Design a protein with these regions (language model features):
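C-terminal membrane-cytosol helix-exit motif in multi-pass small-molecule transporters
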Residues: 93, 183-218, 413-420
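Juxtamembrane intracellular "pre-TM" segments in multi-pass secondary transporters
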Residues: 1-7, 203-246
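Extracytoplasmic gate region of multi-pass secondary transporters
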Residues: 30-35, 241-293
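C-terminal transmembrane helical hairpin of 12-TM major facilitator-type secondary transporters
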Residues: 302-352
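Helix-loop-helix hairpin linking two adjacent transmembrane segments in secondary transporters
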Residues: 150-201
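C-terminal ends and interior cores of transmembrane alpha-helices
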Residues: 84-105, 317-329
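Cytoplasmic helix-loop-helix junction between adjacent transmembrane helices
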Residues: 116-153
Length: 428
């Protein structure tokens, strides 16, 4: 059967990164403007924390089944489904603002706002889909750099939007800002439709080529990683590997924490230090974009030093940053702590996904689903805990809340050490 295989590794990487970029921006859906909803709706600190974190709930949990779905389809279909759901949620948020904001947007609409936030967060779940899609395009020895580029560039979106949203608020207002976001998301979906291609094996299978022949021809085209199981089997294989759960714990700290802080930092900077929304957005962007960009060289570092060693070193940096934020009452030291956390979290995130294909080569999507899904759940779980510190201790609760990251960093260092022992024993 003569079937043409379209695309290339580079095109596959560009397509996946584009789709992830526009979907992942929903991490900053409410963070930069949460104070506006708090004022008009009369929300408590904990309610604000749940609002900014809710997109990450669906964005994390949906990564599990959709990440595993990649092992049967190659990623294109899951990507388009998630991005379309996110677009629907964004349109709903915009319509609610146009119809009710500010005078009629009362607290009784809070559940509806949470639902639309959850729907908008579906785009965040594209992360594990893209991880699998890119991993099937590239050979294992280039997974650190390719996945680092994918995740690092895609992760820039929340920080960029946290910086731009306060600017567009001044120019276009709240409704105009969200409308511009919707247009950008729609353009991103169209761009992914044109560029987001599956790896050769999946293209051949979709064209009706028998599995053995599709595998042989894909190998001739340079593909080295192949699925060997369906969705349930892929998740099952991954779940039976203890190393999967070590990566989940580490990723909960570094990537879940990254999402949590990207959503929480605008509130922290404005409420604790009294900064303007523009300055708070800029500082949040420095953290978020910094953690994202450093993920690219972090992937190359993991290729050279190994994922486990890179994870341990970067987690120590994260711990130091968290200690500074917990104990510092000064602005300068708090900024230093945030920068150190950005460096540590960004590099560790790259190290984790250098290790994902090593855990189960035959079920990359399953491992990526568990790690990306449950790990990213930290983005939903952590902000309400930090909000509870504020509710209990007032202003002093803002720095005290970072003790959560101190504990998580220590726990993750232990997990990384145990992971090193498990993988070393397997290869011995």
């Amino acid at each position: 059967m003569n079937v043409h295989v379209a695309g290339s590794r580079t095109r596959g990487l560009i397509g996946a990164t584009t789709g992830f970029f526009v979907g992942f921006a929903a991490v900053s859906l409410f963070g930069p403007v949460a104070h506006r909803f708090q004022e008009v709706m009369g929300l408590t600190p904990v309610m604000v924390a749940f609002l900014v974190a809710t997109p990450s709930l669906t964005g994390s949990l949906l990564r599990i089944p959709f990440g595993a779905w990649v092992d049967t389809t190659g990623g294109r279909k899951p990507f388009l489904v998630l991005l379309s759901l996110s677009l629907l949620g964004m349109v709903g948020v915009w319509a609610l603002i146009v119809a009710l904001y500010p005078d009629h947007l009362v607290v009784s609409f809070y559940p509806l706002l949470l639902f639309l936030a959850a729907l908008s967060g579906c785009g965040i779940a594209t992360f594990s889909v893209g991880i699998g899609q890119v991993a099937y395009w590239y050979p294992p020895e280039r997974h650190g750099s390719s996945l680092g580029a994918y995740a690092g560039l895609g992760n820039i979106a929340p920080g960029l939007f946290a910086f731009l949203l306060p600017i567009t608020l001044t120019a276009w207002g709240l409704a105009g800002s969200y409308l511009a976001w919707i247009i950008l998301l729609g353009a991103g979906i169209a761009a992914y439709w044109l560029t987001g291609l599956n790896a050769p094996f999946f293209q051949l299978r979709r064209a009706g080529v028998p599995e053995d022949e599709a595998r042989r021809r894909a190998e001739e085209l340079g593909q080295k990683v192949f699925p060997s199981a369906g969705i349930r089997a892929s998740l099952g294989i991954a779940a039976r590997r203890s190393a999967t759960w070590s990566l989940v714990g580490i990723y909960f700290t570094t990537f879940g924490g990254f999402i949590a802080l990207t959503a929480w930092f605008p509130t922290y900077w404005m409420s604790y230090f009294g900064l303007s929304i523009g300055t708070a957005g800029t500082l949040t962007a420095i953290y978020s974009v910094g953690a994202s960009v450093i993920r690219v060289p972090g992937g190359s570092l993991a290729d050279r030093l190994g994922g486990e060693a890179t994870a341990v070193g970067s987690l120590v940096v994260t711990l130091v940053g968290a200690l500074l934020l917990t104990s510092s009452p000064t602005f300068a030291l708090s900024v230093t702590g945030a920068v150190l956390m950005a460096i540590g979290m960004g590099i560790c995130n790259a190290a984790v996904f250098k290790l994902v294909p090593q855990v189960a080569k035959e079920a990359v999507g399953g491992v990526a689903g568990w790690v990306g899904g449950l790990g990213a759940f930290g983005g939903f779980a952590i902000p309400p805990i930090m909000g509870a510190f504020v509710s209990a201790r007032g202003q002093a609760g803002y720095p005290l809340g970072f003790v959560v990251f101190v504990a998580l960093a220590v726990f993750s260092i232990v997990l990384a050490w145990l992971l090193h022992r498990r993988l070393a024993a397997r290869t011995a």
